Amino acid sequence: FGKDSQRYALIGVPLGDFDVGYTNSVAGLSAETQAAPEGMYRYNKHHLVPFGEFIPPGFRWFVQMMNMPLGDFTRGPLNAPPFAVRDQRVAPNICYEDLYGEELAARFADPRQAPTIMANVSNLAWFGEQVAIHQHLQIARMRSLEFQLPTLRATNTGATVVIDHEGL
């Protein structure tokens, strides 16, 4: 990422600290953010997974009984701004957030900020060789078809693919 670089990257990473709280996030990197790291693009996951990313109300007793070190991630906003890449607006989502089309649709509320590309980052290793790996790819394909937008999908297991606006 030199100062004149035309390279961009989205990286899935937990961000935050003990005092403020942690978020399951996507960080957007570019030459501009290298020069001013405080201006780094950040998407914080909105639709958190029960027990994996937050403890549902009324179930703290279960975590205490199991003596498991589980904590809560902080939820991000529903209508997060996109990551600007040249003349494109990339809308990240994390893991199974692409299952919730009505939540993704909220990102189209402002036509000036509406995504032109969707990007999904997922840690699917905990599924093993289960059907969920293939199901998640099919969900991403349907979202591309639904919104008529391409999707960039990066996973540590499963399918890392580029899906066109027709879901192919």
What are these regions (language model features)?
Residues F1-L168:
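Enzyme catalytic cores with a strong preference for nitrogen-chemistry domains
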